[in-house]
Design a protein with these regions (language model features):
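Noncatalytic, basic helical substrate-engagement surface that gates or grips nucleic-acid strands
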Residues: 1-135, 139-161, 165-167, 247-248, ...
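Non-catalytic nucleic-acid-binding/docking modules located in mid-to-C-terminal regions
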Residues: 47-50, 148, 165-301
Length: 301
């Protein structure tokens, strides 16, 4: 089981009321994330678990390709290193606490310098050698869905408690494309939440129709450039006008699948790795209940 950790703790923060630690610090995201993990482990009983981390939430190599990529979330540009992301003031202090608690539990936290959690997930899900559940609220990861390799997404767009199990049939029914076409579909459609403009005038229906007819983005572009190809003049013009965008967007949308990651140490712990540290963290931050719940679930897994 691969967790898109930031996607989960952001949802925990915005989906839960303020919960204060003894010192008055809000810890709702910490508690919510721990309860999410408890629920998922209890329901799915994974043998391995990794909390995948954004070591760089807006990698420079993606920004160099499309400068609007996540630009609306930047609060401070940093010349060397990741830009500062807009994060609520009462969520920001909770992130290091999350790291400490996960470490005390012995739950693997996996990141890669210069890459997003999506890229870590893409790499770990590829050739995993076992069934993989990807837990995320990010639709981009639908591109990883693969029935043959038993890779599916547990989509938490509507909340972890109401997550949807995304397989190839789900993607087909929802968007009218195959999971293997989803990255091209997302490239054509665009995604305002990530600052990806898409092809102007091409929405989900047109993107699905084009992929159904031509198969992939390369063939769509080839048809648009071929006067003899059967393509409506208006669509042809839109694809042609987006040529510069389409030259680079596929590399931004596609998640990495070949990062040099250490795959050892991903087994689900059956007990906390550092009980003393975990107890101290639980006392300091008022986390007794969620820590006890997750400890109990791990012992039963």
């Amino acid at each position: 089981m691969l967790l898109d950790t930031a996607s989960m703790y952001f949802r925990a923060y915005f989906g839960s009321p303020e919960i204060l630690a003894p010192d008055g610090t809000n810890v709702n995201a910490v508690r919510g994330l721990l309860d999410y993990i408890s629920r998922l482990v209890d329901q799915y009983r994974p043998t391995h678990l990794a909390c995948c981390w954004d070591e760089d939430w807006r990698p420079a190599w993606r920004v160099e390709l499309i400068d609007t990529y996540k630009a609306h979330r930047v609060v401070e540009a940093v010349p060397v290193g990741p830009d500062v992301e807009e994060v609520p003031d009462t969520l920001l202090p909770q992130v290091p606490v999350i790291r400490e608690v996960l470490s005390a539990f012995g739950i693997a936290v996996v990141g890669a310098a210069g890459y997003e959690a999506d890229d870590v997930i893409g790499t770990l899900a590829t050739d995993a050698g076992m069934p993989v559940d990807v837990v995320t609220g990010d639709r981009d990861l639908f591109q990883l869905v693969d029935d043959e390799r038993a890779v599916r997404v547990l989509y938490i767009g509507k909340g972890v408690g109401r997550h949807e199990r995304v397989d190839e049939a789900w993607v087909r029914d929802k968007y009218g494309v195959e999971a293997g076409q989803y990255a091209d579909f997302a490239t054509l459609r665009g995604d305002a939440s990530d600052g990806l403009p898409g092809v102007k005038g091409v929405g989900e229906k047109t993107a699905a129709t084009l992929l159904g007819r031509f198969g992939d983005l390369a063939r769509i572009r080839a048809a648009a450039a071929d006067p003899a190809a059967e393509m409506a003049a208006g669509v042809r013009a839109k694809v042609a006008a987006a040529s510069d965008y389409l030259d680079v967007a596929p590399r931004v949308v596609a998640v990495a699948r070949d990062l040099p990651l250490d795959r050892s140490g991903l087994a689900l712990p059956v007990a906390p790795a550092d009980p003393a540290a975990l107890s101290a963290l639980a006392e300091r931050w008022g986390l007794d209940s969620p820590v006890a719940r997750l400890t109990g679930v791990l012992g039963e897994a």
